[in-house]
């Protein structure tokens, strides 16, 4: 779980494995702040240009920034780029890195938040990493999630990466202006090399699956015997789908979102919760399509997470899709699914999910129950959702 003020975790997630450097990086975001985009090439440049004694040569650093910018391609929704008031010369190096994408159809969004990276060592060997997040590439001050998976170098078999490969392969099709030939070749090379990748899974996880949403992609099954839904934006029909069947469902959202859907879609949830307004400053009262606006930082809850128990398995989904009709009915999105055994595997996943939250300042990770005005730690919400 990303603290609203935490940028360190993203920078660490971009850090190459030992004795490796960045070869290719492809990212996606809905809104894009060009100054935030600089974090990526500057981070890679610092990793590669820093001397053993901890010092870096200024000219070498600038050259490393330019070189790494040539290896990074970011797709974002057209018209959703925040340009700084004072243009910095270094931003010119990012000009070809940014690829605007047209909305998939009127009323829908290009909304995924993904990084797929390939690193290379001097021997020409590759290592891959994928980051699936709910945070845009901006300076938002919001509560978000991120999943980071590295390639397992000792694996003798591969995961089913076809959905992720197809997602990357389709990105250029919606571009307002196609990437340069060099960048398109990088994307094609990355798609091909992902074919045989096996991911290192968190303790307690048995499988990983990728779920592109939008277009002709099929939806994941988010229904189950018991579930927990965390989403800042809601729609009634999606809530009724998520709570269909089973005997216990919990929902965490924003107060304005809960009020907007009315009581009927909430009948399927045993309890509903909002972020404690005494702990954090919540988001503004704006609908989903207008909330993530260019140049206006998000605040409050922005994480999207679906925790579902079916039989003896627990399924944890997180990524960019809100619990809305747009999120599961037309937006371009991507979720990652971690499958764990029950109950031990689930409990380990919960511990990993909330470990960062537990180290925040007192009170900042609390949720308030609307119906009973209870204040409950996030960890207890997750555990209670499956009766552990």
Q: What are the roles of these predicted feature ranges?
A:
Residues 1-226, 231-369, 374, 378-380, ...:
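PLD/PLD-like phosphodiesterase catalytic module centered on the HKD motif
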